[in-house]
Design a protein with these regions (language model features):
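Active-site environment of divalent metal-dependent phosphoester hydrolases
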Residues: 10-14, 35-39, 57-62, 84-89, ...
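Short acidic, glycine/proline-enriched helix-loop-strand junctions
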Residues: 43-52, 116-128
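Binuclear metal-dependent phosphoesterase catalytic core
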Residues: 15, 22, 65, 72, ...
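Glycine/small-residue-rich loop that forms an oxyanion/phosphate-binding "nest" at active or ligand-binding sites
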Residues: 51-52, 57, 63-80, 85-100
Length: 158
């Protein structure tokens, strides 16, 4: 399964669409900021399953700040990351990953791409697909109980 991971789009729908067209994913995950962007992308690509969570700039108190997904045989948590303090360290995220036996912890918020394997858990931040910085996104590959991740610059070959 090829999964496109987006975060911090901040209104830049065209960059998200470019990533979808390039990667032709089996699924899309949007990690917040902005909720409406994820909804618009889901409307544009109704045949691609999507999961999304609100970010710190989204006013969606009725929505869960994080979701636990089962992708293949993998336990994957998606969140914006601000509730786990990811701007300063991955300590809280790491404790949560260990406690919840996560195979992957996906977060955004920092606008900085990151792929890091700690113990059994893959930590992936796709960076920002929005405006201002060099746009990036993430790719997850899931096969059974194996999960791998990478980040891609939108302006480079995937």
């Amino acid at each position: 399964m090829n999964i496109l991971v987006l975060s911090d789009s901040h209104g830049n729908i065209s960059n998200m669409e470019e990533a979808v067209e390039r990667e032709k994913p089996d699924m899309i995950l949007h990690l917040g900021d902005c909720w409406r962007d994820a909804e618009r992308l889901a409307e544009r690509y109704p045949d691609i399953p999507m999961e999304h969570v609100p970010g710190n700039c989204d006013c969606r108190p009725e929505e869960p700040a994080e979701k636990l997904l089962f992708l293949g045989d993998c336990r994957v948590l998606i969140c914006q990351g601000h509730t786990c303090g990811v701007k300063t360290s991955l300590l809280t995220a790491g404790l949560k990953a260990e406690q919840d036996h996560l195979d992957a912890f996906l977060f955004g918020h920092t606008h900085k791409p990151l792929v890091d394997k700690r113990g059994r858990t893959l930590f992936l931040n796709p960076g920002t697909v929005g405006k201002g910085l060099r746009p990036t996104y993430g790719i997850l590959t899931v096969e059974g109980d194996r999960i791998d991740g990478r980040t891609v610059f939108l302006d480079s070959e995937s």
